[in-house]
Amino acid sequence: MKRFWAMVCALFLSVSLLLTSCANVPTGLTGNFREDTLALISSLREAIALPENDPNKKAAQAEARKKLNDFFALYRRDDSLRSLSSFMTMQTALNSLAGHYSSYPNRPLPEKLKARLEQEFKQVELALDREAKS
C-alpha cells in the first residue's frame, strides 16, 4: 500500500511540475503585446521618477527589473514583433536600462539616460497608437 501511495504522490508531483512549467505567459503579463508594453512603461516611469532617498525605491527597482525580465522572456523570441517599430524601440530602451542596472546596480540613473528613456517611451507609445490604427 505504501508503494501505491508513493507512486500516486510522485505522479501528482510530476504532473503539477509539468503543468506549471508549461505556462507561456510570465506572471503579471497578459500576452497582449500592446497592453504589456504600456504597463511596463508605466511601471518603469514610476521606478525612474522616485527620488533616490525614497524608502520604496529599492522595491520599485526590483519590481521593474522583474517585469523587464518577464517582458524580455515573453516577447524577445517572437518573430512577428521584430518588424514593429514599437518593439524595436522598446527593446533599445530596455537594453540600455538593463545595461545600467547590471553595470552600476548601486548608482542612480544619470539624467541623460532618464531623458533618453523618456524619449524612447514616448516613441513607443506613438508607434503603438500607429500600429493599432493600421
UniProtKB/Swiss-Prot annotation:
Name any GO cellular component annotation. plasma membrane-derived thylakoid membrane
Partners and quaternary state?
A: Part of a photosystem II (PSII) assembly intermediate complex PSII-I; crystallized from a strain deleted of psbJ, it forms monomeric PSII before addition of the oxygen evolving complex. PSII-I includes 3 assembly factors not found in mature PSII (Psb27, Psb28 and Psb34). Binds to the lumenal side of PSII, adjacent to the CP43 (psbC) subunit.
N-palmitoyl cysteine lipid attachment residues: C22
The reply to whether Repeat figures as a keyword in the UniProt entry is no
Q: What domain of life is recorded for the organism?
A: Bacteria
Q: Keywords of this protein's UniProt record, alphabetized?
A: Lipoprotein, Membrane, Palmitate, Signal, Thylakoid
Signal sequence interval, chain numbering? 1-21
Q: List the disulfide bonds.
A: none
Task: Give the membrane topology.
Answer: Lipid-anchor
Q: Which family does it belong to?
A: Belongs to the Psb27 family.
**What biological-process GO terms show up in the record?**
photosystem II assembly; photosystem II repair
Organism whose genome encodes this protein: Thermosynechococcus vestitus (strain NIES-2133 / IAM M-273 / BP-1)
**This protein is called what?**
Photosystem II assembly factor lipoprotein Psb27
Q: What does this protein do?
A: Plays a role in the repair and/or biogenesis of the calcium-manganese-oxide cluster on the lumenal face of the thylakoid membrane. Its presence in a photosystem II (PSII) preparation prevents binding of other extrinsic subunits PsbO, PsbU and PsbV, and thus assembly of calcium-manganese-oxide cluster. Psb27-containing complexes lack oxygen evolving activity and an oxidizable calcium-manganese-oxide cluster, but have a normal reaction center.
One Pfam family hit: PSII_Pbs27
Renumbered to this chain, the positions carrying a covalent lipid of the kind S-diacylglycerol cysteine are C22
Q: What is its main location?
A: membrane
The listed locations are: Cellular thylakoid membrane
